[in-house]
Amino acid sequence: MTNFSPREIVSELDRYIIGQKDAKRAVAIALRNRWRRQQLSDELRDEVMPKNILMIGPTGVGKTEISRRLAKLAGAPFVKVEATKFTEVGYVGRDVEQIVRDLVEVGITLVREKKRAEVKAKAHQNAEERVLDALVGTTASPATRDSFRKKLRANELDEKEIEIDIAETGAPGGFEIPGMPGANIGVLNLSEMFGKALGGRTRKVKTTVKDSYELLVNDESDKLLDNEQIQREAMAAAENDGIVFLDEIDKIAARDGGIGAGVSREGVQRDLLPLVEGTTVATKYGPMKTDHILFIASGAFHVSKPSDLLPELQGRLPIRVELRALTKEDFRRILTETEASLIRQYKALLETEGVALDFTEDAIDALAEVAVQLNANVENIGARRLQTVMERVLDDISFNAPDRGGDTLMIDADYVRKHVGDLAANTDLSRYIL
């Protein structure tokens, strides 16, 4: 779990997302509260519940991007799900408890990678011995092994082809029984059982010495790991530090009428209630409590309103944050100030062909202006509009780049307007460029 301060979390998010100070502060405080809770005594820790967040704002202003960046910062099990993918229990589709099972799987992967890093030195040592076995055999004299070991460490044998045995890591056995959610619960994993009895299945792999190390280090790491301990730690991490980002929650808000799809939508909300409030979900690693999982919900709420959500669900999302629509200045900053800005991306892409791009200040102004106009006249899709505009402006250059290696191309305001200005000015035509 990360121990960044709220200020550090916000400044990290500032590198990738322009504006939206309130939303950044809310998620930063929520993330820091996870760490604060871990410092409490056991009896008080159980009483402190996460304050779930509802982010409201038009599309393309940074709601999903905040969640993506938060996932990398959190250092905790994190899943992002679209609320529209789930259906009420009894309908065809995924049920909401799958969210928790996915969270546990993410936890398992996180803990396994952490444990692998801890035993990497020992695993690398064992992998080297196995490479030597493949090169000179197990019966070679110590002198021969030492001579090959020196060559191996000097990278003289990197291209030599060897055959190694790798543990079989096939898909887990078992199957789901209809009507019994929980994936593999109560189903004997026969392949695992027989695998242990017979010492595990292996497969032969032909590879070079250089490429064999990654396979062998992973194989040796897994031998040194205790799977039961990994599962216990992953379950604890998912229960106490897990974060679930529920995107598009406005799409399951039942609108007036309550007929047709609206009924199923309300059913999904009712299924979400116990999950957000705190319940126990059966997973294939054992029961998992959801009391301390942090839920961050987000939606554009173009058609529906937050008040269209079930009152009980609204009550379980106590922190409301509104994200504002983007202005021309925001678009300018998105193009130039973010860590991996669009202009930087396109410059890097075309540099691979030997073409240097140079954007003037008035070109950046023009790009922002066109994006604002299109959003106002056609459909407001926020920062995503910039991708449409950039693609349109650089269409000819991208197409002809292989023939223009070594050129330096200047993009100015006139060039931008020539390629998109006329379309942006005409609402009817601009509809056809997204």
Swiss-Prot record:
Keyword presence, Chaperone: yes
Annotated positions binding ATP: I18, G60, V61, G62, K63, T64, E65, D247, E312, R384
Keywords: ATP-binding, Chaperone, Cytoplasm, Nucleotide-binding
GO molecular function: ATP binding; ATP hydrolysis activity; peptidase activity; proteasome-activating activity
Entry-linked Gene3D superfamilies: 1.10.8.60, P-loop containing nucleotide triphosphate hydrolases
Protein family per UniProt: Belongs to the ClpX chaperone family. HslU subfamily.
Protein function: ATPase subunit of a proteasome-like degradation complex; this subunit has chaperone activity. The binding of ATP and its subsequent hydrolysis by HslU are essential for unfolding of protein substrates subsequently hydrolyzed by HslV. HslU recognizes the N-terminal part of its protein substrates and unfolds these before they are guided to HslV for hydrolysis.
Protein name: ATP-dependent protease ATPase subunit HslU
Species of the source: Sinorhizobium fredii (strain NBRC 101917 / NGR234)
Gene expressing this chain: hslU
